[in-house]
Design a protein with these regions (language model features):
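Phosphate-handling active-site elements
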Residues: 29-33, 194, 220-234
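Nucleotide and nucleotide-moiety/phosphate-recognizing core
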Residues: 86-95, 192, 223, 228-229
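Conserved phosphate/ATP/ADP-binding segment of small-molecule kinases
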Residues: 117-193
Length: 265
């Protein structure tokens, strides 16, 4: 059985963070493990509290995993301060896992900054160069490329700029999402731009979509798929999870990560 590690925050409501990651991993029939960076008190209506773990505790978590059940892929999500980012980078350099997927949780889809400047700089300069693929949304891609993205051509140019900053070693998946009124995503890998068309699904319950997509990519890479195939398969999975129409909570609810298990019985 393939093994996948998620390094991210905990969502007590189960829709995002490591809970969404582990559900995605189970649906893909891989063995999921988690190293928690922070505890969050949140639900479908908002985030009401965040408590980070200490760098020493995160280091202990990562060592316990890497020294015992070595992962075939690693997904990195919410990391809210520079010390934790440096801790993760140190362990990745020490253990050298393959198939690192980084969801750079820097800016919300509404444009709100989620990281302080120091933490953003650490994420960009220390952690991103270690990743095999990063999955920014449009606002995050704008920050990383220092350009405004208002049309599809801008997504391609921004992805090239980001890739060049990372010396072309890291694939860049720019997620179209709500910002361009399209569900199409752009993968820039090995100096090639590949579009993945997505179906616009009429469902306001999108809590945890970014976490789920990056985890599904990690699962597919762990199973031996190439980068383009991993992204394509992950897109299909998240579309199905949205289409299932799960409706929980008073706000933007979660996806049905388990729909895949029903299909693949």
């Amino acid at each position: 059985m393939k093994k996948v590690l998620t390094i991210a925050g905990s969502d007590c409501s189960g829709g995002a963070g490591i809970q969404a990651d582990l559900k995605t991993m189970m649906a893909h029939k891989v063995y999921g493990m988690s190293a928690i960076t922070s505890l969050t008190a949140q639900n479908t209506t908002g985030v009401y509290g965040i408590s980070d773990v200490t760098p020493d505790f995160l280091a202990n978590e990562l060592e316990c995993i890497f020294d015992d059940i070595f992962p075939d892929a690693v997904k990195i999500g919410m990391v809210s301060n520079s010390e934790l980012i440096r801790t993760i980078a140190d362990k990745l350099k020490k253990y050298k896992p393959k198939n690192i997927v980084l969801d750079p949780v820097m800016v919300s889809t509404s444009g709100s900054r989620l990281l302080e400047e120091e933490a953003s700089a650490s994420l960009i300069n220390i952690l991103m160069p270690l990743a095999d693929i990063i999955t920014p949304n449009i606002p995050e891609a704008e920050v990383l490329s220092s350009m405004k993205i208002s049309k599809s051509e801008d997504m391609v140019e921004a992805a090239k700029v980001i890739s060049d900053k990372l010396d072309g070693r890291t694939a860049v998946l720019v997620k179209g999402g709500h910002d361009l009124n399209t569900a199409n995503d752009l993968l820039y890998c090995d100096e090639r731009a590949v579009w993945f068309e997505g179906e616009r699904i009429n469902n306001d319950n999108t809590h945890g979509t970014g976490c789920t997509l990056s985890s599904a990519i990690a699962c597919n890479l762990a199973m031996g798929n190439d980068m383009a195939s991993a992204v394509e398969n992950a897109k299909k999975y998240i579309s199905g999870a949205l289409k299932d129409g799960l409706n929980l909570g008073k706000g933007s609810g979660p996806l049905n990560h388990a729909f895949w298990l029903d299909i693949n019985r």
